Amino acid sequence: MNELQVKFNEKVKQDIMKNFGYKSPMQIPRIKKIVINMTAGNEVSNTKAVEEVINELTLITGQTPYKTHAKKSLASFKIREGMPMGGKVTLRRDKMWDFLQKLIDIVIPRIRDFRGISPKSFDGRGNFALGIEEEIIFPEIDFDKIRRNKGLDVIIVTSANTDSEAKYLLEKLGMPFAKATN
């Protein structure tokens, strides 16, 4: 079992149950899955760029991503319907906990000029989205092999009903949110 998963089971569950006044342990919000999405950006027409995205996502997550394709044709961006755009990975169970621990302990502290994660990135249903501008902050990515920074999206899907429950859960797991300024 991962350290973060042990922390969740031993400390965070009881803390959430006490703080929100849940009567049953089944009411406690949990992290269901983490979805990581990455696109080739301006280089979509270049098939090598899409393959680089797939390889980088495989290195970052330890799981083979599936290719995402364009839904519509856009002449201004030279994109045709069905053209490969990037990759997407859904992490669950142990790989999810391993990725979340790596994200909190290693990746987020390496973000340049980091002052905390904006707590405004919740969707109203207890899910959290985080945009990472540079994939080179992941320890698996070799800086010398990157032609261009692509960035990626990380979506943490929870079973929480409200944003406050999800934020409390992620804070207790160690997510460094920025303090609210007045």
Swiss-Prot record:
SUPFAM superfamilies, per the entry: RL5-like (SSF55282)
Gene Ontology biological-process entries: translation
Presence of keyword Protein transport: no
Keyword tRNA-binding: yes
GO MF terms, alphabetically ordered: rRNA binding; structural constituent of ribosome; tRNA binding
One GO location term (cellular component): ribosome
UniProt keyword annotations, A-Z: Ribonucleoprotein, Ribosomal protein, RNA-binding, rRNA-binding, tRNA-binding
Family membership noted in the UniProt record: Belongs to the universal ribosomal protein uL5 family.
Complexes and interactors: Part of the 50S ribosomal subunit; part of the 5S rRNA/L5/L18/L25 subcomplex. Contacts the 5S rRNA and the P site tRNA. Forms a bridge to the 30S subunit in the 70S ribosome.
Name used for this protein in its record: Large ribosomal subunit protein uL5
Organism of derivation: Mycoplasma mobile (strain ATCC 43663 / 163K / NCTC 11711) (Mesomycoplasma mobile)
